[in-house]
C-alpha cells in the first residue's frame, strides 16, 4: 500500500482553474507511480461520507476536474455566507483529510495558496506539505519584497520597478513584462 497523498486544489484566487488542472495532472502522475492520491477543493471541501474512502483512487479524475471547474465560487458572496455561519476559508472536512494524509501536495495557485496563509495553518496543525514554509511563501509572493530580500544578497534578478497606486510613471522601457506585485505566476 502506497503513501496517502491529498492534493489540494481550487481555492478562491483568480488562478482557481489552472490550480484544478495542475492538481489533476499531479494526481494522475502520483497514481501511476503507486501512490494513493486524490484531489480535494480546499474551499468547497468534501462530504463527510466520502472522507473514509478518500484515498481509494477509484474516482475519475477528468470528471472530477470538470466538476470542480464548474464550481467556481462567487468568492465575496460565499465568504460572507460562511462568516454568517461562523465558518472560515477551509471547506468541509479539508483539514481532517489533510491530517489523515501522509503528506499534502500543494496544488494551489495565487492568493490563499502560494502566499503562506495555508502553509502557516498546516504548520500550526502539524500537517506535512510540499513546497516552501509559510514565511518563504509569504515573502516570495510579493515580487517587490522578494527583490528587496534577494538583491542585497547578490542574487541576480531582472531589472524592474514597482508601481504603486497614484505613482506617476516617468518611463518604462519596452519590451517589458507587467505583473501584479502579489498575484500568482499565471497572472500578468
Q: Which role does the model predict for each range below?
A:
Residues 154-156:
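Short secondary-structure junctions
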Residues 1-135, 139-141, 145, 149-152, ...:
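ATP-binding N-terminal substructure of ATP-dependent carboxylate-amine bond-forming enzymes
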Residues 161:
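Conserved beta-strand elements flanking the ATP-binding pocket of the protein kinase catalytic core
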Residues 19, 174-188:
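Glycine-rich phosphate-binding loop of ATP-grasp-fold ATP-dependent ligases
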Amino acid at each position: 500500500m502506497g503513501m496517502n497523498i491529498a492534493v489540494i486544489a481550487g481555492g478562491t484566487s483568480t488562478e482557481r482553474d489552472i490550480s484544478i488542472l495542475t492538481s489533476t495532472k499531479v494526481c494522475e502522475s502520483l497514481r501511476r507511480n503507486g501512490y494513493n492520491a486524490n484531489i480535494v477543493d480546499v474551499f468547497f471541501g468534501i462530504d463527510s461520507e466520502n472522507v473514509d474512502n478518500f484515498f481509494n483512487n477509484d474516482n475519475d479524475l477528468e470528471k472530477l476536474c470538470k466538476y470542480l471547474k464548474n464550481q467556481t465560487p462567487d468568492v465575496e458572496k460565499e465568504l460572507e455566507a460562511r462568516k454568517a455561519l461562523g465558518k472560515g476559508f477551509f471547506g468541509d472536512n479539508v483539514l481532517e483529510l489533510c491530517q489523515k494524509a501522509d503528506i499534502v501536495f500543494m496544488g494551489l495557485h495565487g492568493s490563499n495558496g502560494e502566499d503562506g496563509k495555508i502553509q502557516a495553518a498546516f504548520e500550526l496543525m502539524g500537517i506535512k506539505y510540499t513546497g516552501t514554509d509559510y514565511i518563504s511563501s509569504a515573502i516570495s509572493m510579493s515580487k517587490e519584497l522578494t527583490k528587496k530580500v534577494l538583491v542585497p544578497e547578490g542574487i541576480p534578478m531582472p531589472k524592474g520597478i514597482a508601481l504603486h497606486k497614484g505613482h506617476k510613471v516617468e518611463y518604462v522601457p519596452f519590451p517589458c513584462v507587467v505583473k501584479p506585485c502579489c498575484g500568482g505566476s499565471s497572472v500578468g
